[in-house]
């Protein structure tokens, strides 16, 4: 039984190390920056998401990774707040951050992004420059004064 447990620990530890080596560090740092910002409830965004280890992207709830790149973010209705910078996430295909209190989101240069839902936030501007794959955009119930296409 001890051997099985030790082998399992080694295998799982190796998988986490492999993910850390393969992951796009720029994307990880940008997401970590947002996760550490204050949520609408006053604690950190990562706490609202139930994330216990901010240094382990493989365990982040709501983020789907493929080949070390974020391809989907689903953080709908989590009482998140602050500024989410996804600029340059070229593998990202879908984002749903609706029903939060985001004040800014930047998805420019997300060339694979096809679906973006940022409805019911506190956005005053939205930059979706160079998002040629975008076919669905929901941004109603914000405070938009500027939409950059």
Task: Annotate each predicted stretch with a short phrase.
Residues 78, 100, 118-121, 139-142:
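Consensus "Asn ladder" position of solenoid repeat domains
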Residues 99, 109, 130:
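Residues on the solvent-exposed faces and adjacent turns
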Residues 2-94, 111, 132:
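N-terminal capping/linker segments that flank leucine-rich repeat
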Residues 65, 145-149:
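Short intrinsically disordered, low-complexity coil segments enriched in acidic
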Residues 72, 83, 91-96, 104, ...:
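Conserved LRR concave beta-strand detector
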């Amino acid at each position: 039984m001890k051997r099985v447990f030790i082998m399992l620990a080694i295998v799982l530890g190796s998988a986490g190390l492999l993910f850390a080596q393969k992951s796009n560090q720029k994307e990880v740092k940008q997401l970590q920056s947002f996760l550490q910002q204050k949520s609408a409830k006053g604690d950190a965004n990562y706490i609202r998401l139930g994330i216990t280890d901010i240094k382990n992207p493989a365990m982040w709830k709501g983020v789907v990774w493929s080949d070390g790149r974020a391809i989907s973010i689903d953080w709908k209705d989590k009482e998140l707040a602050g500024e989410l910078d996804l600029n340059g996430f070229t593998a990202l295909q879908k984002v749903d951050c609706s029903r939060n209190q985001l004040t800014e989101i930047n998805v420019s240069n997300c060339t694979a992004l096809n679906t973006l839902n940022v409805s019911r936030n506190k956005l005053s501007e939205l930059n979706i420059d160079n998002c040629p794959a975008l076919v669905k955009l929901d941004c109603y119930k914000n405070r938009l004064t500027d939409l950059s296409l």
